[in-house]
From Swiss-Prot:
Keyword terms: Ribonucleoprotein, Ribosomal protein, RNA-binding, rRNA-binding
Organism: Nocardioides sp. (strain ATCC BAA-499 / JS614)
Classification via InterPro entries: Ribosomal_bL9, Ribosomal_bL9/RNase_H1_N, Ribosomal_bL9_bac/chp, Ribosomal_bL9_C, Ribosomal_bL9_C_sf, Ribosomal_bL9_N, Ribosomal_bL9_N_sf
Protein name: Large ribosomal subunit protein bL9
Keyword Nucleus: no
Family affiliation: Belongs to the bacterial ribosomal protein bL9 family.
Annotated Gene Ontology cellular component terms: ribonucleoprotein complex; ribosome
Signal peptide: none
Function summary: Binds to the 23S rRNA.
GO terms under biological process: translation
PROSITE patterns: RIBOSOMAL_L9
């Protein structure tokens, strides 16, 4: 089955890639979850639009990624969240909140899909997250979670 990926699928490809997969995998997993759509002749326009959107979000090159990395790692980023009396949060800090705090602190827009949180952040204090800026460049950002 020939599919066009609409989101990144680990081990398969990036958005806009045309891939060949087994029928059951495509029909039962990728298409229902919105990770891919069936390939058609008119789908080439979709591929072009997905690749154009991805290129606009992507970091230009390795040097630009290094510049963004130095900006992000320069100082800790404060994230304000609602917390209870014992310092426990109501929920967890989301990647959307982290991306917003990074944009406010550094002035650089970071795609939330590039932020990797190894363990859910559910308490106040200092935490670390990594941001994959380029295939070869990732930044480790210090977060200070403070009560709002």
């Amino acid at each position: 089955m020939k599919l066009i990926l609409t989101q990144e699928v680990t081990g398969l490809g990036a958005p806009g890639d045309v891939v060949e997969v087994k029928d059951g995998y495509g029909r039962n997993y990728l298409v229902p979850r919105g990770l891919a759509m069936r390939w058609t002749r008119g789908g080439e326009k979709t591929v072009d639009s997905i690749k154009a959107a991805r290129a606009s979000r992507a970091v230009r090159d390795h040097d630009h990624a290094e510049q963004i990395k130095t900006k992000l790692e320069a100082q800790p980023v404060a994230v304000k969240v609602r917390a209870g009396a014992g310092g426990r949060l109501f929920g967890a800090v989301t990647v959307t909140e982290i991306a917003g705090a990074l944009a406010d602190a550094s002035g650089e827009q970071v795609d939330k899909r590039t932020i990797v949180v190894t363990n859910p952040i559910k308490s106040l204090g200092a935490h670390e997250v990594s941001v994959k800026l380029h295939d070869e460049v990732s930044a480790v950002v210090a977060l200070n979670v403070i009560p709002a």
